[in-house]
């Protein structure tokens, strides 16, 4: 809605100088829709990115130097859909001794999409096994688009959040890390009613008995053609709930199902259009927000995107950068 846009523009202008700049990065700092995880055995960092069979980079610290290690699935996915050799939006988790990586098979503007999964014991290139589709799939008749997966466990239950544009963000219960639960029906957890519903990249995490739902909004791509109007570029927002399955509201109590969302990070200084975010619970730095952004000192094309990260600060159980 128009009011939603005005609120975000106001918040963006008010916070333009309030954010900390991204933490240092050296080596291979390119990324797009990053997935980030710290290996349990030795603390080594692995960063995954959209493109090809999912790019892998690794480093001994968040600051780098990051090395390019190849791909998760060099030949692409076994899911037979357009986009199977150009996989998107990796999401990582660790469960019972195994690392799981969710990825999306789709193409721009299409709802012919599926969420696939690969597993590894180490996260190293060459160690991944593709299991194909999780059963989370969409077609043009679906109310959602099954990309941008994000896993969370609550007690003995596992869930995957997903969605982009259309009716935005949904959640479905999983049988295990590989397959959706039989008979489970996705339910909506967030919706932006304005315009063409620019909302995607759900990432949920838990802290102090709250579940936080972060997501990206605004215009994600096309900066190499033109700059969007100020405030219309990618940004990161957050809502929270005492339940992982719904009831998310922003700082003002506005429901995430009714265009709610408190701004967490937007363009500032040399950082333009941050998004595609996730949260790492780092062994030494605590909760770390990671994302991609266009560095205005380098370029605005996807090929120029950079890896950004910031330690989160907390006030009244709300995160800030």
UniProtKB/Swiss-Prot annotation:
The record marks 148 as: Important for catalytic activity, responsible for pKa modulation of the active site Glu and correct orientation of both the proton donor and substrate. Residues 1-18 form the signal peptide. GO terms for cellular component: extracellular region. GO terms for molecular function: arabinan endo-1,5-alpha-L-arabinosidase activity. One of its GO terms (biological process) is arabinan catabolic process. Endo-1,5-alpha-L-arabinanase involved in degradation of pectin. Its preferred substrate is linear 1,5-alpha-L-arabinan. This is Probable arabinan endo-1,5-alpha-L-arabinosidase C. Pfam families: Glyco_hydro_43. Glycans are attached at residues 192, 224.
